[in-house]
Amino acid sequence: MRKPLLTAALLATAAWTIPVRAQQIDLSDKIRLNGYSNFEFEYMPSKAGRGDGNASFDAQEFDLVFNIIPTDRLRVNADMRWEHGVATEDSRGNAAISHAFAEYTVRDALRLRAGKILLPFGIYNEIHTAKPAIFLYKEPFAVYKTEKLGGVRRFQPRSGAGLEALGSGGLGGVDADYTVLVVNGETTGKKDPFEEDDNRAKSLTARFRVHPASWVMLGTSYYHDQLTEFDATGKDTGRRTRQSSYVQSLELSPGPVLVQGEWARGNVTPSSAPGTDMEGWYAVASVMLLDRYRPYVELQHFDPSRKLANDEVRIVSPGVNLRMDGGLYLKFQVDKYHSLPANTRFKGVDYTELTAAVAVAF
């Protein structure tokens, strides 16, 4: 009987002491919780086209962002995301960790990260889930979601597991920042790229930006990876498909005016077949009125293969972003799609889609 009594006593002691110790640790200044949500609507009035003819609502995402700061130099950041009304018992929606990393600051010019990290590619990839931070209805597909415009692959994946070095400082009297990220890269087989690579080659992403003036940003980003090629039985052939992409970025923000533009090119080359050269760009001009209304016009162009003719697609999108209250934003945008007959997705069928969103940051 002594052992059960001793066990009970130990459990009682633990139950008594653990809450006391927890009360002695004040984490109020160490943990910060933020988040955002996004609700969307899309409708294509015409009968022909690749838009949504059913006028659908989409509970697009709900995110919680944790910043844990154990010391002045150490930070842990994670974004937990639930998409499309996730319900696991019904196999609906998606739940994911958008990113989760530990960051150690050596100095302003050098911070080190390890974990699951969003690729520092262009203006929007690192913030693509944070819809309240994007005044457009969505990030431009011509650079960030090229598969939706007939591309064989995106210019870059969203994220990867690996190590990152980044920093900021002055360069000849001009503000500048850089980022270099090495991750497992994309896997083309069954392996989880956030757990295990399927070849020895690592993916490299790098970005460099300068600010010649407070209202001017010039940037360039580069991405490279080697993808494993498998045979019909799923065995690694030892051959690799090479992918390289780069994007040039420009942002001008004099006063209430905001102008953004990016131009990207990429190549996907299998070991024993001709490669595919993709090209995409967008430009958007907007103005802030009364610190609340931001009307804008966006133009996108994407060429899925520069070696093929008549496969381009162009999108013209007038819209407006309304800041209603604090972190509450309403977005209205009209997307006018025009494509040429050889485009594998749109096949030359033009159409217009009406879109709207309710984005909240908290």
Residue ranges and their predicted role:
Residues W16-A22:
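Sec/Tat signal peptide C-region and signal peptidase I cleavage site
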Residues Q24-M44, G53-G185, R200-K202, R209-M217, ...:
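Outer membrane beta-barrel
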Residues S286-M288, R292-G327, K331, D335:
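Outer membrane beta-barrel transmembrane domains
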Residues L322, G327, G348-F362:
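Outer-membrane beta-barrel "beta-signal"
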